[in-house]
C-alpha cells in the first residue's frame, strides 16, 4: 500500500479478523469502540492510510503495506 492507497475502516476490521461481517464492524464502530490514531471513530467508511493506528477491543493494529 503506497501513500495514495486507502482501505475503509470496516474493511480493515474484517481483514484483520476483528469481526467476521460488515454488520459486526458497523456495530463495533457505531458503538464508539474503535479508535483511529487515538480518536474515537464512528464512520465505518473512514479511509485509512498506511501508518494509521487502530485500537479496538484491547488490541492495537497498524495499517501496513500489503504483501
What residues fall within each predicted segment?
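A basic, amphipathic helix-loop patch mediating RNA/tRNA/ribosome contacts
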Residues: 4-50
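A detector for short, charged/polar N-terminal pre-domain segments
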Residues: 1-5, 63
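C-terminal structural segments of small proteins and small subunits
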Residues: 43-67
Amino acid at each position: 500500500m503506497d501513500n495514495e492507497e486507502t482501505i475503509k475502516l470496516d474493511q480493515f476490521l474484517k481483514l484483520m479478523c476483528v469481526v467476521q461481517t460488515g454488520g459486526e464492524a458497523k456495530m463495533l464502530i457505531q458503538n464508539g469502540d474503535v479508535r483511529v490514531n487515538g480518536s474515537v471513530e464512528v464512520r465505518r467508511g473512514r479511509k485509512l492510510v498506511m501508518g494509521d493506528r487502530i485500537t479496538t477491543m484491547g488490541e492495537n493494529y497498524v495499517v501496513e503495506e500489503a504483501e
